[in-house]
Amino acid sequence: MCIRDSITTLWKGNLQLNPAMLFSIGLVSTFITGGLTGIILGDSTLDINVHDTYFVVAHFHLVMGISALYGLFAGVYHWFPKMFGRMMNKNLGYIHFWVTAVCAYGVFFPMHFIGMAGLPRRYYTNTAFPYFDDLADINVLITVFALVAGAAQIVFLYNFIHSMFYGKETVQNPWRSNTLEW
């Protein structure tokens, strides 16, 4: 219901795909992914196979972690002009969004597969059992995506701090919004 309402709010709207809107759409995307993977976890016959595996880790962190971050970033990009009277750098915002979005799915999408392969969570090493040796390369890929995602957050911090002092001064209503906040 929530997803349908979010999508129909955008329907026939005059969308401006600025970083705030991209993060908002990304939030809806992660909720859709979470809803689809949640069906598997909600079905007891399927949940037996993926219970306490990386599938659960991927589902939970994609839905709860990434969605929360997307909401936070959307809010910061949208309300920054109101808070500081300056605009954040839009190009750095686009870089921040696309690198974060690709890396978020690059981290958590493969986790679904290694979870379906049976890799349990809470193991200090995946090479404790010979069966899991084939999954080590996927974990290396996940680690690389996670490190790149961390670097994207450094871009955000730079954009935030630099724009606070040196960003382009904004007009009274930078988003041309008709709501009372602006």
PLM regions: where:
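Repeat-solenoid scaffold signature
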Residues: 134-166
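Membrane-interface interhelical loops and short amphipathic "cap" helices
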Residues: 39-60, 113-138
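Extramembrane terminal tails and long inter-domain/linker segments of multi-pass membrane proteins
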Residues: 117-134, 161-182
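Short, small-residue-biased leader/transition segments that mark boundaries at the very start
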Residues: 1-3
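Structural signature of transmembrane alpha-helix termini at the membrane-water interface
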Residues: 8-11, 36-43, 80-83, 106-117, ...
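Generic, ordered loop/turn and secondary-structure boundary motif
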Residues: 16, 47-51, 56, 176, ...
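Juxtamembrane/interface motifs at transmembrane-helix termini
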Residues: 42-43, 86-87, 178
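Interfacial and helix-entry/exit segments of alpha-helical transmembrane bundles
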Residues: 8-38, 54-57, 62-71, 75-109, ...
